[in-house]
């Protein structure tokens, strides 16, 4: 395999989704870390520079607007990190707030992995 494309953090409380995303992105050349909960993601962000964070908006114990904390935390600690939010329950209000806080992409689940990869690659090229 050639050079790695960058470092990616995947945040999702569903282990099957976390595993599938991690395996897919590793397979196309990314270095991948993953977190199951908000606190774990924040700890990783505090000590590691990521090219992109892909986070589920709803984690265990985190719902609605509270799920946007990952955007604020990422922007505060690592302004250069691109943030992609995934959700199965989008509302126009939450999407607008996510974008206002600095989310680079707000995507509806399910999303084909090649399409997600293309979005991530585009964000990295833009930065």
Mark where each language-model region is.
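Two-component/phosphorelay signaling modules centered on CheY-like receiver
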Residues: 15-33
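Short amphipathic alpha-helix used as the core "switch/output" element in two-component signaling
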Residues: 43, 65-79
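Alpha4 helix (beta4-alpha4-beta5 surface) of REC/receiver domains from two-component response regulators
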Residues: 65, 69, 90-107
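Acidic, metal-coordinating helix/loop segments flanking the phosphotransfer/catalytic sites
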Residues: 34-52, 76
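C-terminal output helix
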Residues: 93, 111-120
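Conserved acidic carboxylate
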Residues: 12
């Amino acid at each position: 395999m050639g050079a790695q494309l960058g470092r990616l953090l995947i945040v999702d409380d569903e282990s099957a989704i976390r595993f599938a995303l991690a395996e897919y992105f590793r397979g196309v050349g990314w270095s991948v870390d993953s977190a199951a909960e908000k606190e774990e993601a924040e700890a990783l962000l505090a000590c590691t520079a990521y090219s992109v964070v892909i986070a589920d908006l709803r984690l265990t114990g985190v719902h609605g607007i509270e799920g946007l904390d990952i955007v604020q935390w990422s922007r505060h600690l690592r302004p250069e990190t691109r943030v992609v939010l995934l959700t199965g329950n989008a509302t126009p209000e939450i999407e607008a707030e996510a974008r206002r806080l600095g989310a680079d992409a707000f995507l509806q689940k399910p999303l084909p992995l090649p399409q997600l990869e293309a979005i991530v690659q585009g964000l990295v090229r833009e930065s």
